Amino acid sequence: NAKARPYMVCRSGSAGIQRYAQTWCGDNYTSWKSLKYNIPIITGMGLSGQPNEGADIGGFAGPAPTEELFVRWVQNGIFQARFSIHSASNDNTVTEPWMFRESADTIRDAILLRYRFTPYLYSAEYEASQTGAPIMRALVYDFQNDPKAWEESFEFLFGRDILVANVLEEGAKTRTVYLPAGCKWYDWNDKFRCYEGGQTIEVPVTMATIPMFVREGAVIAMADNQLMTMEGDHTTALHLIVAPKGTTTTTLYDDDGITNDFKSGVYRKTTITTTAGERVTMNFASEGSYKDTVETIKVEMIAKEKSPFWVTLDGRKIEHFLTRRKFDAAAEGWYYSQSKKAVEVKYANPAKNHALTVSFEQFDLIGM
């Protein structure tokens, strides 16, 4: 394909290599130590100007990984810019995602989660191409005024808004996590449980657990339709996880993923400006000529204090459903989840600039 963008991975390079190629951590040895220390290698490369870095998942040299080690390595690898499972094991085995039958579902779920993150990851790659911001970021990249962030080497930010603290110890039942100061954090695995930043917590883990925390102020884009490839499939059901705080701007970027047509304006860049307060308003503004593939939008907005009073789309009130069953059956509407303390809103993509407003204002109980 003469129009295709080149893709290059190289073993070595010098300052400026990020303009031409991805790099990787070298031929690592299969061990828990390699899994752990590949993280600061990747984040260190990010601080050195190379935003796209990855490691050989499962280890390149040495024996085949144990089942537990391989699961944990895949769970880490899904956040790397370059996610590659391959090996030249010394025991004549080949490392494959399906090599352990009992853990195949856990490994599959982790890989599918990466594909669900495609809108978020591709937008982060766009940001990297414009600013050099790493895909896997050392905590100190965003939290330079927090002394403890300077000391943390084995947690990282996936893009701007998701803190990841992979399980890195054999047989672990808990994971100690430092949450940087300056904002609140919401536990991805515990119904968005809220933690104040600037503290160390301990969370329980199983083999399936990937400790992740949503940063206050985040808008995280996911695909609710399960993507299976990064270039052939497109997001048709967009899912936005929102943790309102102040005024924030999030950019979603999309193009065909293959050609250089984006250079002539064939791309789609959507800027989401979220303003928090008694009314939370999300303004969506798009540019570019690339066809919008999104058919439906679901907004999952963390709202720990109370349920909204009303929700509008471009000033038109959206129907409120009191039961999950009726909400799930509807094409449009909103529902407040008591278990998560989050409001869910869904609607057909207007295919134009639009505004979604969620009101948490006080209201007249008698007058309503």
Q: Where do the model's predicted regions map?
A:
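Accessory, solvent-exposed terminal regions and/or long lumenal/extracellular loops of proteins
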Residues: 214-316, 324-325, 337-354, 359-368
